[in-house]
């Protein structure tokens, strides 16, 4: 699984106001803005923060104490705080 840095994340393409984020390991990044769309099997570290309107593919995993803005959506089999 590709591990992304903040610089990688900042460079991702934005289409119709939505940042397109491929599948991968985002555990080194803690703060994500609004309207990000993540692929399947993404992995996030502890204490990460997501703005409103983010969407996550199937089987994404989130560390402890992550926070989510309103209207975020999650694919099936996502796990939280594990």
What are these regions (language model features)?
Residues 1-40:
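Extended, small-residue-rich solenoid/repeat segments and analogous flexible loops
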Residues 34-82:
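Thr-biased low-complexity repeat/linker tracts and other Thr-enriched repetitive architectures
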């Amino acid at each position: 699984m590709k591990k992304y840095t903040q610089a990688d994340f900042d460079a991702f393409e934005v289409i119709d106001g939505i940042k397109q984020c491929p599948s991968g390991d985002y555990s080194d990044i803690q703060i994500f803005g609004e309207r990000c769309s993540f692929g399947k099997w993404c992995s996030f570290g502890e204490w990460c923060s997501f703005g409103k309107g983010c969407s996550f593919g199937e089987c994404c995993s989130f560390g402890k104490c992550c926070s989510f803005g309103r209207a975020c959506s999650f694919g099936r089999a996502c796990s939280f705080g594990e």
